[in-house]
Amino acid sequence: MISNLLKMLSYPFMQRALVVGILVSLCAALLGVSLVLKRYSMIGDGLSHVGFGSLAIATALGFAPLAFTIPVVVLAAFLLLRMNESSKIKGDAAIGLISSSALAIGVITVSWSSGMNTDVNNYMFGSIIAMSDEDVVLSVVLSIVVLILFVLYYNRIFAVTFDETFAKATGVRAEFYNMLLAFLTAITTVLGMRMMGALLISSLLIFPALTSMRLCHTFQSVVICSAVLSVVCFLLGMSLSFFLSSPAGATVVIVNLLAFLIFSAIARIREHTA
């Protein structure tokens, strides 16, 4: 077993995948707690569809995929936030409207273009082992920026997560921190698409947070548990993917699902025995 793990770690593409995957998993887990508590967890799914559409356009036009997609997805995140706050189109309806439109644009772009199916499929279904050195550097830098900003503004994010009205009354600029949360989520979603794919990235935001809430009862403990659980599930999923020759993103999701089911069962047993 040890020799197989060492063999896995000896491949440069696996080393890159693990470094990027751990950082993105951490970012997604930390942000996911706030998104789930604010009942906005599906924003990752909506933004990933926007990301797919913009990636298809970037590939067709010969632009750098991540450099083109990140600003587009950030703008979409701000638009979703603005629609949710001031428009008659709220929450899940706004996400569905924007995500389905962006996905349709992406599909049409792919159908009109030739020679780009492989690149687009990598972002649709995930292919972390196919990341270029430039993708790795950009992903690492942006992931570190996301983590630093989350830690720096942790108390403010906590305040707007639990009681936005009270936070405003105490002088917290709730709109700014909601925009910061949307910005960080957009960055994490784009980075996670390379690893998980547009169809599965929302699982990185949702599963660790939901699982941790079955075990912990304070915001801080849920955040810490979610971060640890997300990294552990990613490492287990990547290892199983390597040994079973299964898709990396899908395997990570299955491991997260199993963790959720196991810890939900444990929490239910604890409730009945308490």
Regions picked out by a protein language model, each given a short descriptive name:
Residues M195, L199-A250:
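Transmembrane alpha-helical segments in multi-pass inner-membrane proteins
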Residues V33-M116, S212-I224, S241-F243, A267-I269:
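Short loop segments and helix-boundary regions at transmembrane helix junctions
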Residues N4-S10, M124, I128, L229-I266:
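C-terminal binding/interaction regions
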Residues V50-A60, I98-T109, A130, A174-T185, ...:
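Small-residue-rich segments of transmembrane alpha-helices in multi-pass membrane proteins
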Residues N155-R156, A265-A274:
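Membrane-interface capping segments at transmembrane-helix boundaries
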Residues I2-R16, S87, I95-N155:
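Transmembrane helix-bundle core of multi-pass membrane transporters
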Residues V136-P208:
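Helix-loop-helix "hairpin" substructures at the membrane interface of multi-pass membrane proteins
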Residues A17-V20, P65-V73, D92, G96, ...:
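Loop-to-transmembrane alpha-helix initiation sites
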